[in-house]
Swiss-Prot record:
Disulfide topology: none
One BP annotation, GO: translation
Classification via SMART domains: GatB_Yqey (SM00845)
Family statement: Belongs to the GatB/GatE family. GatB subfamily.
Matches recorded under InterPro entries: Asn/Gln-tRNA_amidoTrfase_suB/E, Asn/Gln-tRNA_Trfase_suB/E_cat, Asn/Gln_amidotransferase, Asn/Gln_tRNA_amidoTrase-B-like, GatB, GatB_C_1, GatB_Yqey_C_2, Gln-tRNA_amidoTrfase_suB_CS
Catalytic activity: L-glutamyl-tRNA(Gln) + L-glutamine + ATP + H2O = L-glutaminyl-tRNA(Gln) + L-glutamate + ADP + phosphate + H(+); L-aspartyl-tRNA(Asn) + L-glutamine + ATP + H2O = L-asparaginyl-tRNA(Asn) + L-glutamate + ADP + phosphate + 2 H(+)
Subunit-structure text: Heterotrimer of A, B and C subunits.
SUPFAM superfamilies, per the entry: GatB/YqeY motif (SSF89095), Glutamine synthetase/guanido kinase (SSF55931)
Function: Allows the formation of correctly charged Asn-tRNA(Asn) or Gln-tRNA(Gln) through the transamidation of misacylated Asp-tRNA(Asn) or Glu-tRNA(Gln) in organisms which lack either or both of asparaginyl-tRNA or glutaminyl-tRNA synthetases. The reaction takes place in the presence of glutamine and ATP through an activated phospho-Asp-tRNA(Asn) or phospho-Glu-tRNA(Gln).
Origin superkingdom: Bacteria
Record's protein name: Aspartyl/glutamyl-tRNA(Asn/Gln) amidotransferase subunit B
Length: 472
C-alpha cells in the first residue's frame, strides 16, 4: 500500500488596476498587445516600479492564514527563456518572500486537518502564447500582471484533501477581495506536485509536477491519474524508468497526464537579487491592515447569532456572492431562517446553466419583498413559489405586481373567512358532533374544506384561529 504526498502551488492574479511594476492596465479580454509599455515589453532603459497595492494584498492574505509577514523581503530574477517572457527572466521572490509559515484548516469526511503554507510570494505573470494552425503568436497583455504564488507544505494525502484545500484557499482569497480568482480566465491556477511512497516510509520520492490546472474537477482527476500511474509503475518494477522528475500536462479529453519537459531545479534558474529593485521594507502601519470577516468566522456568526444550521451556513459561505446576497436579505429585518430557506432552496433551485447567484434574475431586494409578503400574510408560502417563478422569468415585473397579476393575494378578512366556515360547519353537523366528542383529527378536514372553498386564497393562520373559536 502507498501513501500519497501532494504539495500545491497556486498562482492567483491580484486584482490591482495596474501591473506590478508599471502603470499598464490589468483588464482581461483586451485586444492583444494593447496593455503594454516599455517596461512590460522589456525595452532597454525601462525600469520597474513596485505597485504598493500588490504588497498590501499579499499582506492581507498573510494575515488571513496566520502567517509571518516579513518586514524585509527581496525581489529576485528567475532566469529562463520562453517566448512569452520578454526579459528572459521573471521578477519573483526566492529566499526572502513577503509571507511565510502560514496555515489553513480543511475538513474532509468529517475530519479537520491543518495544512501548512510554506510561503506566499509576489511575482509577475508571463504573457500568453497562442497557437493557431501553423503559427504561434504572443500576447503580452498579461505580462507583468501581479501574481501571488502560494505554496503548501507537502501534507496533502489524497485528491479529496487537495480539492478541499484549494476550495478553502479560493474562498479565503475571494472573501479578502484580493483577486476575482476566476479559474476559467486563469486568475486562479494550480500546479500539483505528486509523489508516492510505501506506507510508513518518511522518505520523499520522485515528484512529478502537473501544470496549470484550472478547475477543481480536473485537479482531482489529474492527481488520481498520476497516483495510479506511479503506483502501477512501482508494482511493475518500472518506477525508476517511468517516474522521473518532470513537468506533465493534463489531457482534459482523455483524463491522462502527458510528459511536457524535464523539471528544473532552483539552481537552473540562477536566482539573484534584482539590481533594479530595492529590498521591500515594511513600515508598521502596513502590518496593521484590517482584513474583512473570513468564511469560517462568518459561518460561526451565522450559526451562533442567527441560529442557522451548520449545513445551511456552509452553503451561505460557499461564495462571497452568496454570503453578500444573504446578508443583504437579513438587513431588511426579515426572519433569518425564512431567508435561508428561500435563498438556499427556492432561488438556488431555479438557477441553472449559466445562471449563478451573481447574475440571478431575482436580486436580494426583490426576494426580500417576497419574503415580507409571506411574513405579513399577503400571500401563502405555496403561492409565493409561483410568484418567485413568475418574476424569475419576467424580470421587469415587481413582486406586488406579480401577486396581483396571478391573483394570489391571500384573504385575511375575518368576516369573509367566517362566512365560509359557518357554511361548512352547518353542512357537516355530524362531523362537528364527532369532533366535539373527541375525534380531534377531523380538525384537518374542516381546514381542508375551508381552504378548498376559498380556492387556496384564505390565510391558513386565520382559518385555524377562527375554526378553533367556532368549534370550541
Amino acid at each position: 500500500m502507498f501513501e500519497v504526498v501532494i504539495g500545491l502551488e497556486v498562482h492567483t492574479q491580484l486584482n490591482t488596476k495596474t501591473k506590478i511594476f508599471c502603470s499598464c492596465a490589468t483588464s482581461f479580454g483586451e485586444a492583444p498587445n494593447t496593455n503594454v509599455c516599455p517596461t512590460c515589453l522589456a525595452l532597454p532603459g525601462a525600469l520597474p516600479v513596485l505597485n504598493e497595492e500588490a504588497v498590501k494584498k499579499a499582506i492581507a492574505f498573510g494575515k488571513a492564514v496566520n502567517a509571518t509577514i516579513n518586514k524585509k523581503s527581496v525581489f529576485n530574477r528567475k532566469n529562463y527563456f520562453y517566448p512569452d517572457l520578454p526579459k528572459a527572466y521573471q521578477i519573483s521572490q526566492f529566499d526572502i518572500p513577503i509571507v511565510e509559515k502560514g496555515e489553513l484548516f480543511i475538513n474532509v469526511k468529517g475530519e479537520n486537518k491543518r495544512i501548512g503554507i510554506t510561503r506566499a510570494h509576489l511575482e509577475e505573470d508571463a504573457g500568453k502564447n497562442i497557437h493557431e494552425n501553423n503559427f504561434s503568436k504572443v500576447d503580452l497583455n498579461r505580462a507583468g500582471t501581479p501574481l501571488l504564488e502560494i505554496v503548501s507544505e507537502p501534507e496533502l494525502r489524497s485528491s479529496d484533501e487537495a480539492v478541499a484545500y484549494l476550495k478553502k484557499l479560493h474562498s479565503i482569497i475571494r472573501f479578502l477581495d484580493i483577486s476575482d480568482a476566476n479559474m476559467q480566465e486563469g486568475s486562479f491556477r494550480c500546479d500539483a506536485n505528486v509523489s508516492i511512497r510505501p506506507k510508513g516510509d518518511t522518505k520523499l520520492y520522485t515528484r512529478v509536477e502537473i501544470k496549470n490546472l484550472n478547475s477543481f474537477r480536473f485537479i482531482q482527476k489529474a492527481i488520481e491519474y498520476e497516483v495510479k500511474r506511479q503506483s502501477e509503475a512501482w508494482e511493475d518494477g518500472t518506477y525508476e524508468q517511468e517516474v522521473v522528475q518532470e513537468t506533465r500536462l493534463f489531457d482534459t479529453t482523455n483524463l491522462v497526464t502527458r510528459s511536457m519537459r524535464g523539471k528544473e531545479e532552483a539552481a537552473e534558474y540562477r536566482y539573484f537579487p534584482d539590481p533594479d529593485l530595492l529590498p521591500v521594507l515594511l513600515k508598521d502601519e502596513f502590518l496593521d491592515i484590517k482584513i474583512p470577516e473570513l468564511p469560517d468566522e462568518k459561518k460561526a456568526r451565522f450559526i451562533d447569532e442567527l441560529g442557522i444550521k451548520e449545513s445551511d451556513a456552509e452553503v451561505l459561505i460557499s461564495s462571497l456572492e452568496m454570503s453578500r446576497f444573504f446578508e443583504s436579505l437579513i438587513s431588511q429585518n426579515l426572519n433569518p431562517k425564512l431567508c435561508v430557506n428561500w435563498l438556499n432552496t427556492e432561488l438556488m433551485g431555479l438557477l441553472k446553466g449559466e445562471l449563478t447567484i451573481e447574475n440571478s434574475p431575482v436580486d436580494a431586494q426583490k426576494l426580500g419583498i417576497l419574503i415580507k409578503r409571506i411574513e405579513d400574510g399577503t400571500i401563502s408560502a405555496k403561492a409565493a413559489k409561483d410568484v418567485l417563478a413568475f418574476v424569475f422569468e419576467n424580470t421587469s415585473v415587481e413582486i406586488d405586481e406579480a401577486i396581483e397579476k396571478l391573483g394570489l393575494k391571500q384573504v385575511s378578512d375575518d368576516s369573509a373567512i367566517e362566512a365560509v366556515i359557518e357554511q361548512i360547519l352547518n353542512a357537516n353537523a355530524d362531523k362537528v358532533a364527532e369532533y366535539k366528542s373527541g375525534k380531534e383529527k377531523l380538525f384537518g378536514f374542516f381546514v381542508g374544506q375551508t381552504m378548498k372553498e376559498g380556492k387556496g386564497a384564505f390565510n391558513p393562520a386565520k382559518v385555524n384561529e377562527i375554526l378553533k373559536t367556532k368549534l370550541g
